[in-house]
Regions:
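Acidic catalytic/metal-coordinating carboxylates
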Residues: 35-39, 61-66
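CheY-like receiver
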Residues: 120-138
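Active-site residues of response regulator receiver
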Residues: 11, 55
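Two-component/phosphorelay signaling modules centered on CheY-like receiver
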Residues: 14-32
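Short amphipathic alpha-helix used as the core "switch/output" element in two-component signaling
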Residues: 42, 64-75
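Receiver (REC) domain active-site loop signature in two-component systems and cognate sites
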Residues: 58
Length: 138
């Protein structure tokens, strides 16, 4: 039986966080949750993660800063930045692999998650050979 993908969901808005957690668990994923950047970095460092869904606007540490720290340690793990604000600065997208509007339908979110997980699985063997340089963040 294949291992369930592990997704780290990070959002300071609990309703959205719980909704995404339920959706992803129903689709067969194992979901870790964090309500802030420091907690997310701790979970990311201590658990194997296949994908990160990361809110941009959070107190203390915005998502782009969290993504930069994550990519410094594990550049091969895909990160999707979430926001209700479609007007993020281009610099906010530097360390992420995708941007997802919080207004996306659950079906579209699942398609994006599946695509990013497929990319992760595709590049994981290559990253093992190249020391994590098989692909780079956007």
């Amino acid at each position: 039986m294949p291992r369930r993908p592990v997704i780290l969901c990070v959002d300071d808005e609990l309703n959205g966080l719980e909704g995404r957690k339920m959706l992803l668990e129903e689709s067969g994923c194992k979901v870790l949750v964090a309500t802030g950047g420091a907690e997310a970095l701790q979970l990311f460092a201590s658990h194997p993660v296949d994908l990160v869904l990361l809110d941009y606007h959070m107190p203390a540490m915005n998502g782009d800063v969290v993504a930069e720290h994550m990519k410094a340690g594990q550049p091969d793990v895909p990160i999707a930045l979430l926001s209700a604000d479609d007007g993020l600065p281009e610099s906010a997208l530097r360390w992420v692999d995708a941007f997802v509007s919080k207004s996306e339908s659950p079906a579209n979110l699942l398609q994006i998650v599946e695509y990013l997980l497929d990319l992760h699985l595709l590049f994981a063997p290559l990253n093992g050979l190249t020391g994590g340089r098989g692909r780079r963040a956007a």
